[in-house]
Amino acid sequence: MNSGGGLPPPSAAASPSSSSLAAAVAVVAPPGVGGVPGGAAVGVKLKYCRYYAKDKTCFYGEECQFLHEDPAAGAAPGLGLHSNSVPLALAGAPVAGFPPGAVAGGGAGPPPGPKKPDLGDPGTGAAAGGGGSSGGLDGPRLAIPGMDGGALTDTSLTDSYFSTSFIGVNGFGSPVETKYPLMQRMTNSSSSPSLLNDSAKPYSAHDPLTSPASSLFNDFGALNISQRRKPRKYRLGMLEERLVPMGSKARKAKNPIGCLADRCKSGVPINMVWWNRVTENNLQTPNPTASEFIPKGGSTSRLSNVSQSNMSAFSQVFSHPSMGSPATAGLAPGMSLSAGSSPLHSPKITPHTSPAPRRRSHTPNPASYMVPSSASTSVNNPVSQTPSSGQVIQKETVGGTTYFYTDTTPAPLTGMVFPNYHIYPPTAPHVAYMQPKANAPSFFMADELRQELINRHLITMAQIDQADMPAVPTEVDSYHSLFPLEPLPPPNRIQKSSNFGYITSCYKAVNSKDDLPYCLRRIHGFRLVNTKCMVLVDMWKKIQHSNIVTLREVFTTKAFAEPSLVFAYDFHAGGETMMSRHFNDPNADAYFTKRKWGQHEGPLPRQHAGLLPESLIWAYIVQLSSALRTIHTAGLACRVMDPTKILITGKTRLRVNCVGVFDVLTFDNSQNNNPLALMAQYQQADLISLGKVVLALACNSLAGIQRENLQKAMELVTINYSSDLKNLILYLLTDQNRMRSVNDIMPMIGARFYTQLDAAQMRNDVIEEDLAKEVQNGRLFRLLAKLGTINERPEFQKDPTWSETGDRYLLKLFRDHLFHQVTEAGAPWIDLSHIISCLNKLDAGVPEKISLISRDEKSVLVVTYSDLKRCFENTFQELIAAANGQL
């Protein structure tokens, strides 16, 4: 009879139902667990630790391979080998309550026979690593009207699609009275430890077999994702490279840090890194290439109990948690099977044990290619030196605490010669081959980029004449220097904003607290009654995204002679709305405009006339969907997905503007207890608004989104664009009778996402190349500024001839050599490359000789650039000392 809660005797490990890994794993089973008596495991020699028996302490602590108690008590659980052993459940032995092939916590055994197993059965082992049901493609496909020949009818559209267009207060989604059932969904990815807790409740999920993106479920089903990791740190001596003789005094040392440095005389290298302990939770993700990271010392690694050849067998045991396993109860809400990870889960897939991102990256420098110099290696207490790395680990004791550090004093490698930096490097080849113009400037940034930056600077520094615009206050709260970005509404204006239902105006202003420019969106005549909406404002402040204009603060003011509500956003100079860039042409609606009765209709416009390139539309889709994904992940809704509220900076960079305005203007007092009660409906409305924006872009006209023109608009899209774009529009505009997620359109975007990523990185390469030119230009300007403070100085220290004597005279002749060259005919010789080359040689101090001729041509001085640099530095330091009062 078994005493381990249903575990079989050790002989069961070799049963046919278990994997071939059982024989290799069973040798490290802990004693006293699962009915295996202490010391009965094959291949394990349980001995009493002689160091613990003598001093009642052991250097290795819990990591010691020997017992710290009397061997007679070895049958008690928890003794003998420690937590680095592999549990018997991994050796193919069934666990109580689970049939063979199923592992508690979501593990799976061999793939079952049925093709579509019941997801609720915990023993089917669905979605096992490399096995399980393929699903997805065999189930019924998601029927979307208009796709694959399906007819697009009015009944297939959402009720809110035709309720309003872009123009209107509620034109961004479904009406509030339309109630959608809030269905919590879950995903098959459960790698976030923060979401996996014992108190999580199970949530219902729709059948992934009917999902159009269920292939994603199968593609990611073979991933080995560990659910929890409990990192533990190794002390010095618990590392893999320790080679301490059994008779060494290092084992008896009391100092847990410096004992090996003081008493170990074997000279064996010791790896001075923190090593994450390999626990049974960490073993759920075996690394086939772990041998590359295991030190190749003379000792046997702790992982050697499981041979490298058997590591591949773990792929059948450690599988993705199946939906039918008890681990389903630990999944977090807000996860979707239809499109992989939902926005509530996707940003949290990184385990908390992963390395934290470095906010300050290390700048590459030549020191990374250097080794410690010979002077730095002659230390008093060298611990060890790794021959491969050439780094010396040194020990220093301060106040009884021993510190270990690695000396990284750089010294050039043998045979390595660095340039003296007086010659410009050529353009990077990957940038040179993508240059659109053959005559691109060599020393300055591109004219197009320069002009764009200058325009942004002009707009940022623009101010108004207060006498001409007295209606604009000089200061509003902590903001000053207001500049209207839109034409100010007349004082007697009655027409309200078509978007927010209030009269609005926009200003650029500078904050007195940080002197940074911001964009102020003023809501005229609004009185803030309930401050509970500030909870949503605080949530918006935390959102930082490249495609969202960040909200900084909201305040009320009476500086405009009436109560006003002001939203402060980041200011993006030079931005224009999508409406003004793409929908400002009145002739673009000719395709949808009907002529009067009795008039002959002229020929339809050419198919491609005035239409946007599909690549541009997909670039917009990627950015807008990315913004929606971030907003929905934060538990908020955009509600301003409108061409008038989407900013375009540069060529294709989008930013969603005016976020959070609707959350304050339409805040319901009945939502005091739960301000996020209606966010699920608003998020569904965001997807409909996104579909309308994409359809308007595809038609290049706002008339295409009207109900009477919808069929004609879809025909235009079908003729001129790909089926993927048509299907995406239909998916966003049709009612799917279920809660949708922005992640559902990611499979439709497909590989076009990589196209946009590639274009963005290529653009970054070009801008970095232009920046490199300006870095050199700034250095040369500072050099000229220093040179100008020396040349032709009328008097210094009461010496009127100071600039004409000594080292200053050489610098004066060098100035003539730079700028006052003439041709043989006596004409001025203007050569920018000559000036740049000579300045770079002066800055580098090259040993090249130069002939300096006096103005009367009676004397010639031959000096080197290194001599000129010495004269230049000494003279400038003399000026600095006099300016600081040190002379």
Curated annotation (Swiss-Prot):
<keyword id="KW-0597">Phosphoprotein</keyword>
<keyword id="KW-0547">Nucleotide-binding</keyword>
<dbReference type="GO" id="GO:0008270">
    <property type="term" value="F:zinc ion binding"/>
</dbReference>
<dbReference type="GO" id="GO:0000290">
    <property type="term" value="P:deadenylation-dependent decapping of nuclear-transcribed mRNA"/>
</dbReference>
<keyword id="KW-0863">Zinc-finger</keyword>
<dbReference type="InterPro" id="IPR000571">
    <property type="entry name" value="Znf_CCCH"/>
</dbReference>
<keyword id="KW-0067">ATP-binding</keyword>
<feature type="binding site">
    <location>
        <begin position="644"/>
        <end position="645"/>
    </location>
    <ligand>
        <name>ATP</name>
    </ligand>
</feature>
<dbReference type="GO" id="GO:0004672">
    <property type="term" value="F:protein kinase activity"/>
</dbReference>
<dbReference type="GO" id="GO:0005829">
    <property type="term" value="C:cytosol"/>
</dbReference>
<dbReference type="InterPro" id="IPR041332">
    <property type="entry name" value="Pan3_PK"/>
</dbReference>
<dbReference type="GO" id="GO:0010606">
    <property type="term" value="P:positive regulation of cytoplasmic mRNA processing body assembly"/>
</dbReference>
<feature type="region of interest" description="Disordered">
    <location>
        <begin position="284"/>
        <end position="307"/>
    </location>
</feature>
<feature type="coiled-coil region">
    <location>
        <begin position="751"/>
        <end position="789"/>
    </location>
</feature>
<dbReference type="GO" id="GO:0031251">
    <property type="term" value="C:PAN complex"/>
</dbReference>
<comment type="similarity">
    <text>Belongs to the protein kinase superfamily. PAN3 family.</text>
</comment>
<dbReference type="GO" id="GO:0006605">
    <property type="term" value="P:protein targeting"/>
</dbReference>
<dbReference type="InterPro" id="IPR036855">
    <property type="entry name" value="Znf_CCCH_sf"/>
</dbReference>
<feature type="region of interest" description="Necessary and sufficient for interaction with PABPC1 but not needed for interaction with PAN2">
    <location>
        <begin position="147"/>
        <end position="498"/>
    </location>
</feature>
<feature type="binding site">
    <location>
        <position position="521"/>
    </location>
    <ligand>
        <name>ATP</name>
    </ligand>
</feature>
<dbReference type="GO" id="GO:0000289">
    <property type="term" value="P:nuclear-transcribed mRNA poly(A) tail shortening"/>
</dbReference>
<dbReference type="GO" id="GO:0000932">
    <property type="term" value="C:P-body"/>
</dbReference>
<keyword id="KW-0963">Cytoplasm</keyword>
<keyword id="KW-0862">Zinc</keyword>
<feature type="binding site">
    <location>
        <begin position="570"/>
        <end position="577"/>
    </location>
    <ligand>
        <name>ATP</name>
    </ligand>
</feature>
<dbReference type="InterPro" id="IPR030844">
    <property type="entry name" value="PAN3"/>
</dbReference>
<feature type="compositionally biased region" description="Polar residues">
    <location>
        <begin position="298"/>
        <end position="307"/>
    </location>
</feature>
<feature type="region of interest" description="Disordered">
    <location>
        <begin position="325"/>
        <end position="392"/>
    </location>
</feature>
<dbReference type="GO" id="GO:0008143">
    <property type="term" value="F:poly(A) binding"/>
</dbReference>
<protein>
    <recommendedName>
        <fullName>PAN2-PAN3 deadenylation complex subunit PAN3</fullName>
    </recommendedName>
</protein>
<feature type="region of interest" description="Knob domain">
    <location>
        <begin position="790"/>
        <end position="887"/>
    </location>
</feature>
<dbReference type="GO" id="GO:0005634">
    <property type="term" value="C:nucleus"/>
</dbReference>
<dbReference type="InterPro" id="IPR011009">
    <property type="entry name" value="Kinase-like_dom_sf"/>
</dbReference>
<feature type="compositionally biased region" description="Gly residues">
    <location>
        <begin position="122"/>
        <end position="138"/>
    </location>
</feature>
<feature type="zinc finger region" description="C3H1-type">
    <location>
        <begin position="43"/>
        <end position="71"/>
    </location>
</feature>
<keyword id="KW-0539">Nucleus</keyword>
<feature type="region of interest" description="Disordered">
    <location>
        <begin position="102"/>
        <end position="147"/>
    </location>
</feature>
<feature type="modified residue" description="Phosphoserine">
    <location>
        <position position="354"/>
    </location>
</feature>
<comment type="function">
    <text>Regulatory subunit of the poly(A)-nuclease (PAN) deadenylation complex, one of two cytoplasmic mRNA deadenylases involved in general and miRNA-mediated mRNA turnover. PAN specifically shortens poly(A) tails of RNA and the activity is stimulated by poly(A)-binding protein (PABP). PAN deadenylation is followed by rapid degradation of the shortened mRNA tails by the CCR4-NOT complex.</text>
</comment>
<keyword id="KW-0507">mRNA processing</keyword>
<keyword id="KW-0175">Coiled coil</keyword>
<dbReference type="GO" id="GO:0006397">
    <property type="term" value="P:mRNA processing"/>
</dbReference>
